[in-house]
Regions:
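Positively charged n-region of N-terminal signal peptides that target proteins for export
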Residues: 1-4
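Extracellular loop and loop/strand-boundary signature of outer-membrane beta-barrel proteins
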Residues: 62-67, 101-107, 119, 156-163, ...
Length: 222
């Protein structure tokens, strides 16, 4: 979650622009629920019992101390904001992350995508808006090591310690249909595509499709 706060100033800048909203513009805050998926790259990581602890290994070799790396998936939570400067043109920012950690061989990981976009809305009417998004951002994979520590046999705690991160630049594009269900409240099914050069270091492809449903509130007249 700390990574989200790093980009809080950008969302604050959008918030400061709310007073400028009028009948030809508007400001949205939204939250998304969805998933992003890509396969495993087929590599492995040695366990602490391996002759090469936490080193790269081949699961196909049949070594019981070599754990395969996973595919990317699971639940993603999103936070975003959009500012429509004109009826058909605007800017926005999004961050999508896994709220909980998942296993990555003997490690754990949490994935984050963030992007800053230009928005083109060829359809922008009272009850519906078609959004076409395109921009740049980053992808961050944070790794940690979980360990159980016990005092005697009565008290045990699960300790998770960060062991590193992998950061990549990304290109982002997306399309969504924003449906206003009650005055300023909306629902937006959205499909996103992230192209992350170097992402094959962690997963099986540099191409990451994502599907989400966003809900939010819009300031400004519809």
């Amino acid at each position: 979650m700390k990574r989200i706060f790093t980009y809080a100033p950008y969302f604050s800048l959008l918030l400061l622009s709310i007073p400028a909203a009028n009948a030809q513009s508007g400001f949205d805050l939204n939250m998304g629920f969805g998933t992003a998926r890509v396969g495993s790259n087929g590599s492995g990581i040695g366990t602490p019992a391996s002759v090469n602890p936490f080193g790269v290994c081949s699961p196909a070799a049949g070594d019981p101390t070599c754990q395969a790396t996973p595919s990317l998936g699971g639940f993603f939570l999103g936070f975003g904001g959009d500012l429509m400067l004109k009826t058909h043109f605007g800017v926005g920012a999004e961050a999508n992350l896994q709220p909980s950690k998942s296993d990555y061989g003997p490690l754990q990981y949490r994935q984050l995508f963030y992007d800053f976009n230009g928005i083109y809305a060829p359809v922008n009417r009272k009850r519906v808006m078609l959004q076409l998004q395109g921009g740049i951002g980053g992808a961050r994979t944070g790794f940690s090591l979980a360990d159980n520590e016990c005092i005697g046999t009565a008290v045990c705690t699960n300790v998770s310690q960060g062991v590193g991160t992998s950061n990549h630049f990304q290109w982002h594009t997306g399309v969504g249909v924003q449906l206003f269900v009650a005055n300023h409240f909306f629902v937006r099914p959205q499909f996103d595509y992230h192209y992350v050069p170097g992402f094959t270091q962690q997963f099986g492809s540099n191409s990451v499709p994502q599907g989400s449903v966003w809900v939010g509130y819009s300031w400004g007249e519809r």
